[in-house]
Amino acid sequence: EHAILHLLYSRFFARAMIATGHLPDSAAEPFAALFTQGMVTHETYRSTDGRWLTPEEVRLDADAPIEIATGASVETGPSIKMSKSKKNVVDPDAIIAQYGADTARFFMLSDSPPERDVEWTAAGVEGAWRFIQRVWRYLDEVPAAAPTAEDSPAALALRKATHKTIAGVTADIEGFTFNKAVARLRELSNALSDSLGVADAPGLAFARREALETLLQLMNPMAPHLTEEMWATLGHDIPLVETPWPDADMTLARDDVILLPVQVNGKKRAELEVARDADKAAIETLVLSAPDVQRYLDGRAPKKVIVVPGRIVNVVV
């Protein structure tokens, strides 16, 4: 409601400025859409005599929460929108002093879709902080490296993960699904971490460095301060914010194997993994030999097999 009123005021101002000649007629509708974000929530705490308590006034013991000042037990309420009246607020200055602004921002974006409420938890903030620290440690583990003429399977797998992440995070940011973008960044970090345990192979050192630099570029909108420091530590003179957004190499980002749904008489009966470049004959052979499809054929020969490459297969009996 609050945001809607602001949009109405802005619309009235736009109309007035059109009337005075300060804006063109095309500005009559100044906003294309409204995106209403969720609220930040937290548990409520109440003393035995009915007083609302702030999270700082409560110690969360293993058995039950207690009031620090009195040692008395505390009633824990549901996680609801933070409000001064119920004192279920967290001081952002304290969080920033302990973890930094980037950690707070990263947690807020990672916990849930932006249109839904996000529950503020100490464990969630701690998890975001640990992830950022892990990325920082890569600076000592991933040296600069030049590309090689040919990539080993391990290098190719990591490069594919990197470029799939670029494509996914780009789409997620454009679609406001920031929590999915953060999840993809964690997956890329895991892939990079796993590669550090693999013996060196052709192209792997370059693939690691590419993954790390890409990780910093994609993290920059969410953790701008630390990623700028890390970027400079890697030896770059141009600030990260001034570098172009990475482009995904779709020949690497595209999966070699796809999941193809299979219908029998119009009803989905199976899903099969097939090579992306498989021809219709190969797909038909694979489908008809699949146990789930044979069960519905029950020994009968199909009247027709309709193959739409990359989309679906329908077996008519």
What does each of the following model-derived ranges do?
Residues 36-46, 220:
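Short, conserved secondary-structure transition motifs
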Residues 22-30, 94-273, 306-312:
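Helix-rich, typically C-terminal accessory recognition domains appended to large enzymatic cores
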Residues 1-8, 206, 221:
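Short, conserved micro-motifs enriched in small and acidic residues
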Residues 18-25, 292-302:
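Active-site phosphate-binding and catalytic loops of NTP-dependent enzymes
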Residues 277-297:
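A short, contiguous, amphipathic alpha-helix enriched in charged residues
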Residues 44-101, 115-126, 251-254, 273-277:
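Conserved phosphate-binding loops in nucleotide/dinucleotide-binding enzymes
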Residues 297-317:
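Phosphate-backbone binding interfaces of nucleic-acid-interacting proteins
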Residues 7, 11-21:
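Alpha-helical support elements that line or immediately flank enzyme active sites
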